[in-house]
């Protein structure tokens, strides 16, 4: 699979999430509630809930909050209902962006997403306008020190994974959506809770951003999109060049 993000770019996005932990937890709970309402409280026969729980655990959502979310969703008095929507568009420089959202007000969310794209010179397109530039698949990440690349590769293949990439910080395992839960369970038994585990959009190829102004505008757009309570995840087919990353490292836009 082409277009793997460099570890520094991954760490930038993860750092932003770490600084907004409460908001991340809120989004994880929303996905759990939606999964239960769409299926059942039993993850064994509810693949979406199984995936939501795996993602929640990888982000260290406390067990008591997970249990509370499941019980709340199963309560007949709970009238929370969220619709899953995917927005697609282009950021400046032809960068393809996919935004996944869960919302109880589609008009509000569409207006927020469109406003974010417009503010930073992007264009919101129709659903399907950029997804052909990505592969929809499972992503599981472990820190490099958990095991050697050879051992991770052997275990991942045995588990049924499609691909694995190891860099200076992370082992990243890619799976078919259908095999995601099985592969994650196998790896969890072997290596413990993953650092990241989710179903997302991985770019088939990436565009290298080597201009400071373009990088700042792009990252501000992504951060603004992620600020929305309705937005679950944002994906893009870009990487920061080493030079641009070093220039921006330590700035508010990277550390925010």
Swiss-Prot record:
The ranges of region (Disordered) come to: 1-21
**One Gene Ontology cellular component:** cytoplasm
Q: Which GO terms describe its biological process?
A: regulation of DNA-templated transcription
Q: A GO molecular function for this record? A: DNA binding
| UniProt-annotated location(s) | Cytoplasm
The transmembrane segments are: none
Recite the UniProt keywords alphabetically.
Cytoplasm, DNA-binding, Transcription, Transcription regulation
Q: What superkingdom does the record give?
A: Bacteria
Task: Check the record and name the InterPro entries matching this protein.
Answer: Integrase-like_N (IPR017856), TACO1_YebC-like_2nd/3rd_dom (IPR048300), TACO1_YebC_N (IPR049083), Transcrip_reg_TACO1-like (IPR002876), Transcrip_reg_TACO1-like_dom3 (IPR026564), YebC-like (IPR029072)
- Family recorded in the similarity comment: Belongs to the TACO1 family.
Fetch the PANTHER family from UniProt.
PTHR12532:SF11, TRANSLATIONAL ACTIVATOR OF CYTOCHROME C OXIDASE 1
Query: Could you tell me what this protein is called?
Result: Probable transcriptional regulatory protein A1I_03240
Q: Which organism is it from?
A: Rickettsia bellii (strain OSU 85-389)
């Amino acid at each position: 699979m082409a277009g793997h993000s460099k570890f520094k770019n991954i760490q930038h996005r993860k750092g932003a999430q770490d600084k907004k932990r409460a908001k991340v937890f809120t989004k994880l709970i929303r996905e759990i509630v939606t999964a239960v309402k769409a299926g059942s409280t039993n993850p064994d026969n509810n693949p979406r809930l199984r995936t939501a729980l795996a993602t929640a655990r990888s982000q260290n959502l406390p067990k008591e909050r997970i249990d509370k979310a499941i019980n709340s969703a199963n309560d007949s008095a709970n009238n929370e209902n969220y619709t899953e929507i995917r927005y697609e568009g282009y950021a400046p420089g032809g960068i393809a962006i996919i935004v996944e959202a869960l919302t109880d007000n589609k008009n509000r969310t569409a207006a927020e997403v469109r406003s974010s794209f417009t503010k930073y010179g992007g264009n919101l397109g129709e659903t399907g306008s950029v997804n052909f530039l990505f592969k929809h698949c499972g992503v599981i990440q472990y820190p490099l020190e958990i095991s050697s690349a050879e051992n991770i590769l052997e275990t991942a293949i045995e588990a049924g994974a499609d691909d694995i990439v190891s860099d200076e910080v992370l082992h990243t395992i890619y799976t078919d959506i259908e095999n995601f839960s099985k592969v994650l369970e196998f790896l969890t038994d072997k290596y413990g809770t993953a650092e990241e585990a989710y179903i997302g959009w991985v770019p088939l190829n990436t565009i290298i951003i080597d201009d400071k102004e373009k990088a700042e505008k792009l990252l501000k757009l992504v951060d603004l999109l992620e600020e929305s309570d309705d937005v679950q995840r944002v994906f893009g087919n870009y990487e920061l060049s080493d030079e641009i990353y070093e220039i921006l490292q330590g700035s508010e836009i990277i550390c925010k």
